[in-house]
């Protein structure tokens, strides 16, 4: 609580409140159900951008494989939803009722043992966060204990994304292959395809996103966050001070993986499917772009970056379908070259100092006017004639 209070005292609560108003009030009142569901999908990518702010911006560790954790979280949720949609009554026309349709198409006759626990919603919710964080722990422990970092770590995470994509596509009978897990309909009997359900899921996504922002800010404001910053800037000094740098790196890598996985789970709920196209190298690099455009040092900026990039992608693909890829590339290159620290950096480095200088000028003008008035007071009003020399009728002493 002290960390959050300090953050409020630093006037950063206003940006989060503004974001909450935009997400919870402006968008629902101004967008139709279809567009609002699109915004909800964009916000699921913002979870990955948040994780990258913690990992890349705050700890100095660039990962080009965050799509792995986004996809794992989405697959864990999709597995539960698919099993619920594959009850024996709904799959009675299959040769093996009671299993997902893609398993029946690939001639599986029984549900694999590792699918069985996903019949439980509680297990699925735990697995959404636990499975990606476990994989992040294994990768991070293996790499950071050997002091693998920098570009080498980025390439390794990219390779992990490629390997997992190939694995998912190759095991079509167990994962749905290139099509992924589709036709997700209900959550514990609640139809998630209706406009009302999508509205509820949108608000749930917003609430989880704001909660993750507060969690990340709490970590940043704690002693652990200070050590992460020191590790980013002077890793050797932190190590010589007696701290186990590798375990701090493992922690922040697992944290970013867990946050990204929550976004993947919300994606499966709001969009209704999950496929390997969200796991590979290309989506992972796009997720880095969200943080770069919004500002890799700003939690709220990363969310705006995810919204801006995806709004731009949608707008350009609709208005200029033949040129939208070039327009998006121009947007990415232009923003990153003009504003190396993203849009949040533009605000902090240009707009805010300019606004403060204007406020100082106005204050100086007001104080100057007040000083002039104090130094040169207005002359007193002239006295009436009867008060001059104590004589009546306004007569002077000579006249008397």
Go through the PLM ranges and name each one.
Residues 1-400:
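Transmembrane alpha-helices and adjacent helix-loop boundaries
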């Amino acid at each position: 609580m002290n960390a959050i209070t300090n953050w409020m005292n630093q006037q950063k609560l206003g940006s989060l409140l503004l974001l909450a108003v935009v997400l919870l009030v402006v968008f629902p009142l101004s967008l139709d159900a279809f567009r609002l569901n699109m915004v909800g999908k964009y916000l699921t990518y913002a979870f990955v951008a948040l994780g990258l702010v913690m990992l890349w911006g705050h700890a100095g560790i660039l990962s080009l494989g965050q799509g792995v954790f986004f996809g794992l979280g989405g697959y864990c949720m999709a597995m539960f939803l698919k099993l619920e949609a594959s009850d024996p009554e709904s799959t009675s026309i299959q040769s093996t009722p009671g299993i997902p349709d893609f398993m029946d198409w690939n001639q599986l006759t029984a549900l694999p043992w590792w699918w069985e626990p996903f019949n439980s919603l509680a297990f699925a919710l735990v697995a959404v966060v636990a499975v990606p964080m476990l994989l992040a722990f294994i990768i991070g422990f293996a790499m950071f204990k050997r002091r693998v970092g920098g570009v080498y770590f980025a390439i390794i995470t990219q390779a992990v994304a490629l390997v997992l994509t190939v694995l998912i596509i190759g095991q079509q009978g167990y994962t749905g292959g290139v099509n992924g897990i589709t036709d997700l309909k209900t959550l514990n009997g609640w139809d998630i395809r209706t406009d009302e359900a999508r509205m509820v899921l949108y608000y749930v996504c917003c609430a989880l996103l704001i909660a993750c922002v507060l969690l990340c800010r709490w970590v940043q404001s704690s002693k652990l966050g200070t050590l992460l910053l020191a590790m980013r800037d002077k890793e050797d000094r932190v190590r010589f001070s007696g701290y186990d740098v590798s375990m701090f790196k493992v922690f922040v890598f697992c944290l970013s993986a867990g946050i990204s996985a929550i976004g993947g789970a919300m994606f499966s709920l709001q969009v209704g499917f999950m496929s390997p196209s969200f796991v590979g190298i290309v989506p992972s690099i796009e997720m880095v772009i969200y943080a770069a455009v919004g500002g890799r040092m700003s939690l709220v900026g990363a969310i705006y970056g995810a919204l801006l990039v995806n709004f731009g992608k949608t707008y350009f693909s609709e208005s200029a379908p033949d040129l939208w890829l070039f327009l998006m590339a121009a947007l990415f290159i232009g923003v990153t070259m003009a504003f190396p620290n993203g849009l949040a950096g533009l605000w902090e480095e240009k707009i805010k100092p300019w606004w403060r200088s204007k406020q100082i000028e106005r204050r100086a003008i007001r104080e100057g006017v007040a000083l002039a008035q104090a130094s040169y007071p207005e002359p007193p009003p002239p006295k009436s004639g009867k008060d001059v020399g104590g004589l009546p009728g306004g007569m002077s002493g000579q006249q008397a």
